[in-house]
Amino acid sequence: MMNDTEFHKLVDHALMIIEEGIDESGADIESETTGNVLTLEFENRSQIVINRQEPLHELWLASKSGGYHFKYNNGEWHCTRSGEEFFALVKRECSVHAGETVDWS
């Protein structure tokens, strides 16, 4: 069972990967972190919002396709419903919102 400090370190790292990955991808996506929330805004004004839910030790993602909850297990964040890996879903959602493939290493 992870403690709150470990949870925040893992989330901070995940959000940094997303911000750096978006920069690396060259896609026209603005990212802004305010408190516990990372907002990705696209050219068409649509948004993806990612925030941390400390009491549950979950990452939540909201986009026009719906809401997703992720738990950390065995070194990765996975969707509590589908099991999809967090970064794969973020890239897919970014690609849908941007209207182009958004990918990073």
Curated annotation (Swiss-Prot):
<comment type="function">
    <text>Involved in iron-sulfur (Fe-S) cluster assembly. May act as a regulator of Fe-S biogenesis.</text>
</comment>
<comment type="similarity">
    <text>Belongs to the frataxin family.</text>
</comment>
<dbReference type="GO" id="GO:0008198">
    <property type="term" value="F:ferrous iron binding"/>
</dbReference>
<dbReference type="InterPro" id="IPR002908">
    <property type="entry name" value="Frataxin/CyaY"/>
</dbReference>
<dbReference type="GO" id="GO:0016226">
    <property type="term" value="P:iron-sulfur cluster assembly"/>
</dbReference>
<dbReference type="InterPro" id="IPR047584">
    <property type="entry name" value="CyaY"/>
</dbReference>
<keyword id="KW-0479">Metal-binding</keyword>
<dbReference type="InterPro" id="IPR020895">
    <property type="entry name" value="Frataxin_CS"/>
</dbReference>
<dbReference type="GO" id="GO:0008199">
    <property type="term" value="F:ferric iron binding"/>
</dbReference>
<dbReference type="InterPro" id="IPR036524">
    <property type="entry name" value="Frataxin/CyaY_sf"/>
</dbReference>
<dbReference type="GO" id="GO:0005829">
    <property type="term" value="C:cytosol"/>
</dbReference>
<keyword id="KW-0408">Iron</keyword>
<protein>
    <recommendedName>
        <fullName>Iron-sulfur cluster assembly protein CyaY</fullName>
    </recommendedName>
</protein>
<dbReference type="Pfam" id="PF01491">
    <property type="entry name" value="Frataxin_Cyay"/>
</dbReference>
